[in-house]
Amino acid sequence: MRNGSVLFGLFFIGHSCSVLLAAPTRASNNFDVESTHAEQWDSNGKRTLQADDSERTLAEERSMTQALLPAAEAFGKTKLPETTVPRASLGSKLNPMTWLKRIWYKLRLWNARFRLAKLKVRTSGENSIDRATLEGLTPLYLKKLKNEIFRYSSSVPRDKVQIEDEYDTFVTKYFRHFDGLFKEKPVTKMGKWDKLVRAMTRTGQLAMRAMLRKVGRTVDKGYSNEKLISLDVSPLLYMRLLVKRGVFTDVEHNKAKIDRLKNYVKAYKEHVMVSQPGG
């Protein structure tokens, strides 16, 4: 009897444990089963459970993928702004190249200023500009000098207007000397230049003759106008050279030489009048 009671107790305990262990399993199974159903409502307004259609689900996923794919590709092609890498520039005060450039500009500016000051002293007296012109001073030389000062100055020169006015005045007076050259019967008006030569010192006369010989050697080589301009051959000395050679005493037989001089004067003037950067 006692043994029967013990067996009955063990049976009861084991059965209870099996029930407790089986309960979560059934609940989870029920949850899994219900999770595969989707809530829907019929035409009568009653809620029904319908199993998910696997093919419909895959179709929806494919449609979503196709809808998102263009946006993803567009995002992938979008270029993000690159981070700017700071680097030394020519304008940086710490760049040694900037200092070298500044020193070079200063030296060029000082040289141009020195030549301008020397020229002003040279052309300060009476008839001094005409005398300097006979010695080889040309508008192109002044133009280059003016442009150097403007280019190598760190700011607008304080005497910019004065330099421009003096340059324009010289150019205007210089080309007036050729007004008679373009008449039907060319006139050189070299009488006043001869007076200036006679008033020169012996050294000045020798220098002017040497300059005429140099111009003669260059012209006789048959260079083009562009080449003569690049060498800055003085048009006035060119004309004086032809006068010394007697070209204007017989215009009919020397028409080609006179026409060549005319063409050079025109080309030279056009070159001078063309504006340049910094000028």
Curated annotation (Swiss-Prot):
It comes from Plasmopara viticola (Downy mildew of grapevine). Residues 1-22 form the signal peptide. The RxLR-dEER motif acts to carry the protein into the host cell cytoplasm through binding to cell surface phosphatidylinositol-3-phosphate. It is found in: Secreted; Host nucleus. Belongs to the RxLR effector family. GO terms for cellular component: extracellular region; host cell nucleus. Secreted effector that completely suppresses the host cell death induced by cell death-inducing proteins. This is Secreted RxLR effector protein 152.
